[in-house]
């Protein structure tokens, strides 16, 4: 379907020599105007879908993986430098998971049904040109992940990257484009504008050559995409709760919660944001978090922290002060007069369930712990804190009934039992990896299939049935 099985034309021209001027004024996929970026991607996609076989896609995806692996340390360092957020060593781990565990064309399996009346095939066909909006929290990781997934499905991509990460994003995109061309693929299979803006997104939404809108970011961005009138895949905000009940392995819970909540300074939408510990588990969990290296705040220090890192929002609630998002715990603690070594990756505070730290998605290594009177109360509190995002939640328990009851109550896209929530996207857990978790639009843990159309071909009158 759509050229997925077509042979590459004989005598196809070799990749252009280094220094050859790209078409439409672009520089290895980076354009000054969004319309040029879309036009170049549209031309590339027509070539890609018509003239490249699945084995060609697989070969080029492997070239992308090799290219990205060679830049992991460089891009991880540059993200920290440009965005001012997160931890270098954790970004290296994120990159490697994205590179190694994002599925390619191999997941585009064909469904076939044969019966008395004939044969039916359903296959995955490309949408065409996809607009992909990427976040500042995972800039190059999302470009790598989306590039592999989207071009594996036969699409091309026009990225609108986050302005705070535009330099490293452009470097990443240009390197991947070079790898694609050197492996025999078309120029400009992935493009972007040098200066990303929301106006560019509006222009792409209005451009008939863009057939699918995809975005990884906050709720406002997803709502903007949904108003575009086009097919949308949206990955929105989360505020993932964790429940630790009295049957849990408390040592394991302390280790994994510390690991997950401090990972990349908690800027990931799927990272643990608040904990509800039941009864006697509460004191033990806080003790285990301290043993891992967390700094436990006093009540007075907690209130100082609220004033420092949160601010009122227009809806009467609280939101993170962007100055402190993704900063090291030691830096945040120093600002309220608490001196800890740089090895301290997490601050912990014991608070009531209606505390601002519980209800606001703070995206920094400050973890509130609520002591719940019962498992039922913990579930109610956790569901309220999750705000109906249906994003991510986790539980530490040996009680299967508790695991099941919380899963049914919270209804999240990702649900992790007895591990850090990053295991839910393949970072330290089974299953494939993605940086686009499409909870609001229902695609879930996206892969190449998510960015394809289902097409059906039927041969009737009993044709091809051999039994």
For the regions a protein language model found, what residue spans apply to each?
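Rossmann-like NAD(P) dinucleotide-binding subdomain of oxidoreductase/dehydrogenase enzymes
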Residues: 109-252
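Structural signal for hydrophobic packing residues in well-ordered secondary-structure cores
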Residues: 5, 38, 42-49, 64-72, ...
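Conserved C-terminal structural/oligomerization subdomain of aldehyde/semialdehyde dehydrogenase
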Residues: 21-24, 53, 338-467
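N-terminal Rossmann-like NAD(P)+-binding subdomain of aldehyde/semialdehyde dehydrogenases
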Residues: 1-121, 149, 291
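Short, surface-exposed amphipathic charged segments that create phosphate/polyanion-binding patches used
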Residues: 205-208, 249, 310-320, 361, ...
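ALDH superfamily catalytic-core signature
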Residues: 28, 222-353
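Conserved active-site and cofactor/substrate-binding residues in soluble primary-metabolism enzymes
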Residues: 29-32, 36-39, 52-55, 59, ...
